[in-house]
Design a protein with these regions (language model features):
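Hydrophobic residues within the alpha-helices of tandem HEAT/HEAT-like
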Residues: 132-136
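Acidic, glycine-anchored loop motifs typical of Ca2+
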Residues: 140
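Small-residue-enriched hydrophobic alpha-helices in membranes
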Residues: 2-130, 147-242
Length: 242
């Protein structure tokens, strides 16, 4: 079913919130209403969520999706992606490099999210946001308590009740890479969804890496395109100051 929501604005805020996320050193997990303070993941949830700026609010939502340790460990990826257009540019570069290596005739200019009119960009954004939420669940850290916290932060970012309800349902449903992949209606969209999932994944975590590999399979990503997407993500990440 096609859903008329404005996911593009929310997604752009989330993708641009990486600097705030890093400045606040991520988000602590909640356990029985108490903020955890482990060595690597002991971070101040309250100070981040009470940030007045939209960037801080978006960082709070993104940090909760990631989980405290992961937010601190891979928060640089968020800075790498910048915003929605930046993600599209990375997908465009990867797709272009892959096309150049194909023996077959060129398929034309890649239609990534940064090059699309609003209606099509919204469709891509919807699929990308679905991929981000699913990837966030891959390590199993989102319980009912954290889901409520995420819902609260999303409500601060958008007044779109339909979008809020859709996100809550996405968070609540069982993780199913095949179902996520069905949102992709083009190779470019599949590439963007995989890149967005890379953003949320700690590739050293077995569960998350297994999810990512299965998502690539369900998206029917060509092995060469998958390599190019991962190379673009890594190259951009290496350019982020430590």
């Amino acid at each position: 079913m096609e859903i008329a929501m404005n996911t593009r604005g929310l997604l752009d805020q989330l993708l641009k919130s990486g600097q705030d996320l890093l400045q606040n050193k991520g988000v602590a997990r909640q356990d029985g209403g108490k903020t955890s303070s482990s060595g690597k993941g002991g971070l101040d949830l309250g100070s981040l969520l009470s940030g007045a700026g939209g960037g801080a609010l978006a960082a709070g939502a993104l940090g909760l999706l990631m989980g405290s340790k992961k937010a601190r460990k891979i928060g640089g990826k968020v800075v790498t992606y910048g915003g929605l257009a930046a993600l599209g540019v990375l997908a465009y570069k990867a797709y272009g490099n892959w096309q150049q290596k194909q023996a077959s005739a060129p398929r034309g200019e890649p239609q990534t999210v940064d090059r699309l009119p609003p209606a099509q960009a919204e469709q891509h954004s919807h699929a990308i946001l679905r991929a981000i939420v699913a990837a966030a669940k891959a390590d199993g850290h989102i319980d009912d308590r954290e889901r409520q916290l995420i819902d609260g932060e999303i409500a601060k970012l958008t007044g779109d009740v339909e979008l809020q309800g859709w996100l809550d349902r996405e968070l609540a449903k069982p993780l199913d890479p095949a179902e996520v992949a069905r949102a992709a209606t083009s190779e470019e969209m599949a590439a963007e969804m995989y890149l967005a999932s890379l953003l949320m994944i700690d590739e050293t975590n077995f569960m998350e890496r297994a999810y990512l590999d299965e998502l690539a399979r369900q998206l029917s990503l060509d092995a060469g395109l998958k390599v190019e997407l991962e190379a673009q993500a890594q190259k951009a990440l290496e350019a982020v100051p430590a």
